[in-house]
């Protein structure tokens, strides 16, 4: 049986993650409070942020920026998107 969480992003019960996706206390919080659906949505946004902003993940500032954007997206109801990103038309 799949683990469910009360996802703070979706504001409803949803399937939880199988394991903490990030190290430390933040990873444990994500595991407790964020659904698989919200995490997958974040991973797509994260990819766009890295690509559109040409972030170098070896740079500590880039990693800090991504962590801030992740927390904003997952826990603060913030809209996060890469500057200049245009979604494909339907």
UniProtKB/Swiss-Prot annotation:
GO terms for biological process: cellular response to oxidative stress. InterPro entries: Fe_traffick_prot_YggX, Fe_traffick_prot_YggX_sf. One of its GO terms (cellular component) is cytosol. Keywords: Iron. GO terms for molecular function: iron ion binding. Transmembrane segments: none annotated. The keyword Iron applies. It holds the Pfam family Iron_traffic. The keyword Iron applies. Could be a mediator in iron transactions between iron acquisition and iron-requiring processes, such as synthesis and/or repair of Fe-S clusters in biosynthetic enzymes. NCBIfam families: PRK05408.1. Belongs to the Fe(2+)-trafficking protein family. This is Probable Fe(2+)-trafficking protein. It comes from Bordetella avium (strain 197N).
């Amino acid at each position: 049986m799949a683990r469910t969480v009360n996802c703070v992003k979706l504001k409803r019960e949803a399937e939880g993650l199988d394991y903490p996706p990030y190290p430390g206390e933040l990873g444990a919080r994500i595991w407790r409070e964020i659904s698989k659906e919200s995490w997958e949505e974040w991973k797509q946004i994260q990819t766009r942020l890295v690509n559109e902003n040409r972030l170098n993940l070896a740079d500590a500032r880039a990693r800090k920026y991504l962590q801030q954007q992740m927390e904003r997206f997952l826990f603060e109801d913030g809209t996060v998107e890469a500057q200049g990103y245009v979604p494909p038309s339907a």
